[in-house]
From Swiss-Prot:
Lineage: Bacteria, Bacillati, Bacillota, Bacilli, Lactobacillales
Alphabetical keyword list: ATP-binding, Ligase, Nucleotide-binding, Protein biosynthesis
Signal peptide: none
Reaction catalysis annotation: L-glutamyl-tRNA(Gln) + L-glutamine + ATP + H2O = L-glutaminyl-tRNA(Gln) + L-glutamate + ADP + phosphate + H(+); L-aspartyl-tRNA(Asn) + L-glutamine + ATP + H2O = L-asparaginyl-tRNA(Asn) + L-glutamate + ADP + phosphate + 2 H(+)
Protein's UniProt name: Aspartyl/glutamyl-tRNA(Asn/Gln) amidotransferase subunit B
Regions annotated as coiled coil: none
Record InterPro entries: Asn/Gln-tRNA_amidoTrfase_suB/E (IPR017959), Asn/Gln-tRNA_Trfase_suB/E_cat (IPR006075), Asn/Gln_amidotransferase (IPR018027), Asn/Gln_tRNA_amidoTrase-B-like (IPR003789), GatB (IPR004413), GatB_C_1 (IPR042114), GatB_Yqey_C_2 (IPR023168), Gln-tRNA_amidoTrfase_suB_CS (IPR017958)
Length: 480
C-alpha cells in the first residue's frame, strides 16, 4: 500500500525588539545568565505587564507579509502550566483570536513549479526561560529569554513531502527577514521549528495519527527527521501496526527519531483572558502605517534583478536568499557597480571567504563602497583579477579604500609601453639562450618570454598590454 505524507509546521520566531514583550528589560541575545531580567520577568507579587507597542507593530507586519487577515480587536490570554523556567506558572499568549489568521505563502518546488501553503494562524506570546541540567546534579534556570517576544506561525497541513517542508521554511525565513521583524537565526534560537507528520492511504481524506517532531535545529535536520518518519511510519502501517500519537526528537548523530513521550490527549492549559492587559483595537491607520514600512520582498526583487539588471534566475535567487547580501548588492549597484561583476564577487570570493572564516557579511570590513572601487580598478586596468583576490582579502579584514591600498602596497599594474618595452629588451639581454632558441624556430620558444617578463615585473605587468608588446618586440627580434 502506498501512503500520502501530510505535514504541518509550527514555527516560533523571536521578534527583534530592543526590549521584552511585557517588561522594559533588554531582549538582547548572548548576555550573562539572568542579566536581562527584572521584577516582571521574575514574577514578583503585585507587578503588572505593560505591552510593548513594537511587538504589535511586528505582529502586524508579519500578518501582512504572510497575506493574513488581522483580528483588529486585540487581547491576550493566559496559558496555564508549571515549569521551572516559567516563574508565573502561566504564559501570556493568544488563544482564540490570534493577531493573524487565514494566510498563505508561495513556495518554489525543485521542478520549478510553485505551490501555495496555507497559514492557519500567527499569534503573539512571550518566550520562557531556559533550563540547564548540570553534571553536579543541580538544574539551573536562566530567565534572560523569559518574556522575549515571539510570534508563532502555524501552517495548514498542506505539505506533502519533506522537500515541500524545506521549501516552506526557506520561503518563510526570507519573508520574515525581509519584513525586518527578526534575524531568524536558528543557531541563536530566534527561529525554532516543530513538525507534525502523518501518513494516510492515497485517496483517503481523513488524516492519519500524527507524530510531533522536536529538536530540529536546522532546515536540513527538519528534512532529514521528516524523511526518517515517513519511512518509520510506512513500515509500521504496512506491517499492520498502528501509529501512536507521540512526541519524538530527532537524533542528529544517528539520523533517527527517538520517543520522548506518548500523547494520550490534548493538553488542558485552561486558557482564559489575561486580566492584567486591557483589550485594544488595531486601527486601519495603524495597519496602513505598517504596510508602508514593508520592503520589496524576495520574489519581487528576483524578478527585478532578472528583468532590469540582466541577471540569471540562478544569480537572482542566490542574491535574494539572504536580505543582508541582497541589500549589500543593492547598495553596490546603486553606487555604479556592474551588476554581474558585483554578483560574481558576492557569490564567489566573498562567499568563500565567509565560509572559511565562519563569519557573516556584517562581521567583516568589506563595504559596498570599497567593493565597487575594487571592481572599478580591475576594469580600468590598475590591477589584475589575480591581484584583486589579494586586495579583496585585505579589504575584508581591514577595510579602507581599494585604490589607496593598491598604491601603497605597490600592486598597481604596469601598463605604460614606455616602461614595459625597456624591461622586455632587458629580458632578451638576460636570456640569450632563449633568444637563440626563438630565432632558430624552436617550437613554443616564445612562450618562455612571458614568464621571464612577469618575473621581471614581479607580476605587475598588465597581461594584455604586456603580451601585445612582447609579441611586437619578438617580431622585431626575429627580423634582425
Amino acid at each position: 500500500m502506498n501512503f500520502e505524507t501530510v505535514i504541518g509546521l509550527e514555527v516560533h520566531v523571536e521578534l527583534n525588539t530592543n526590549s521584552k514583550i511585557f517588561s522594559p528589560t533588554s531582549a538582547h541575545f548572548g548576555n550573562d545568565q539572568n542579566a536581562n531580567t527584572n521584577v516582571i520577568d521574575w514574577s514578583f507579587p503585585g507587578v503588572l505587564p505593560v505591552l510593548n507597542k513594537g511587538v504589535v507593530d511586528a505582529g502586524i507586519k508579519a500578518a501582512l507579509a504572510l497575506n493574513m487577515d488581522l483580528h483588529k480587536k486585540m487581547h491576550f490570554d493566559r496559558k496555564n502550566y508549571f515549569y521551572p523556567d516559567n516563574p508565573k506558572a502561566y504564559q501570556i499568549s493568544q488563544f482564540d483570536e490570534p493577531i493573524g489568521y487565514n494566510g498563505w505563502i508561495e513556495i518554489e518546488l525543485e521542478d520549478g513549479t510553485t505551490k501555495k501553503i496555507g497559514i492557519e494562524r500567527a499569534h503573539l506570546e512571550e518566550d520562557a526561560g531556559k533550563n540547564t541540567h548540570g553534571t553536579d546534579g543541580y538544574s539551573y534556570v536562566d530567565l534572560n529569554r523569559q518574556g522575549v517576544p515571539l510570534i508563532e506561525i502555524v501552517s495548514e497541513a498542506d505539505m506533502r513531502s519533506p522537500e515541500e517542508a524545506y521549501a516552506y521554511l526557506t520561503a518563510l525565513k526570507e519573508v520574515i527577514q525581509y519584513a525586518g521583524i527578526s534575524d531568524v537565526k536558528m543557531e541563536e534560537g530566534s527561529m525554532r521549528v516543530d513538525a507534525n507528520i502523518s501518513l494516510r492511504p492515497y485517496g483517503q481524506e481523513k488524516f492519519g495519527t500524527k507524530t510531533e517532531l522536536k529538536n530540529l535545529n536546522s532546515f536540513s535536520n527538519v528534512r532529514k527527521g521528516l524523511e526518517y518518519e515517513v519511512q518509520r511510519q510506512a513500515e509500521i502501517l504496512r506491517s499492520g501496526g498502528q501509529i501512536r500519537q507521540e512526541t519524538r526528537r530527532y537524533d542528529e548523530a544517528n539520523k533517527t527519531t527517538i520517543l520522548m513521550r506518548v500523547k494520550e490527549g490534548a493538553a488542558d492549559y485552561r486558557y482564559f483572558p489575561e486580566p492584567d492587559l486591557p483589550l485594544f483595537e488595531i486601527s486601519d491607520e495603524w495597519i496602513e502605517e505598517m504596510r508602508t514600512e514593508l520592503p520589496e520582498f524576495p520574489k519581487e526583487r528576483r524578478a527585478r534583478y532578472v528583468s532590469d539588471l540582466g541577471l540569471s534566475d540562478y544569480d537572482a535567487s542566490q542574491l535574494t536568499a539572504n536580505k543582508v547580501t541582497s541589500d549589500f548588492f543593492e547598495k553596490a549597484v546603486a553606487l555604479g557597480g556592474d551588476a554581474k561583476q558585483v554578483s560574481n564577487w558576492l557569490q564567489g570570493e566573498v562567499a568563500q571567504f565567509l565560509n572559511a572564516e565562519g563569519k557573516t557579511l556584517e562581521q567583516i570590513e568589506l563595504t559596498p563602497e570599497n567593493l565597487v572601487e575594487m571592481i572599478t580598478i580591475i576594469e580600468d586596468g590598475t590591477i589584475s583579477s589575480k591581484i584583486a583576490k589579494k586586495v579583496f582579502v585585505h579589504l575584508a579584514k581591514n577595510g579602507g579604500g581599494a585604490r589607496e591600498y593598491v598604491e601603497k602596497a605597490g600592486m598597481v599594474q604596469i601598463s605604460d609601453p614606455a616602461i614595459l618595452i625597456p624591461i622586455i629588451h632587458q629580458v632578451f639581454a638576460d636570456n640569450e639562450a632563449a633568444v637563440a632558441d626563438f630565432k632558430s624556430g624552436k617550437r613554443n620558444a616564445d612562450k618562455a618570454f612571458t614568464g621571464f617578463l612577469m618575473k621581471a615585473t614581479k607580476g605587475q605587468a598588465n597581461p594584455q598590454v604586456a603580451l601585445k608588446l612582447l609579441a611586437q618586440e619578438l617580431a622585431k627580434l626575429k627580423e634582425n
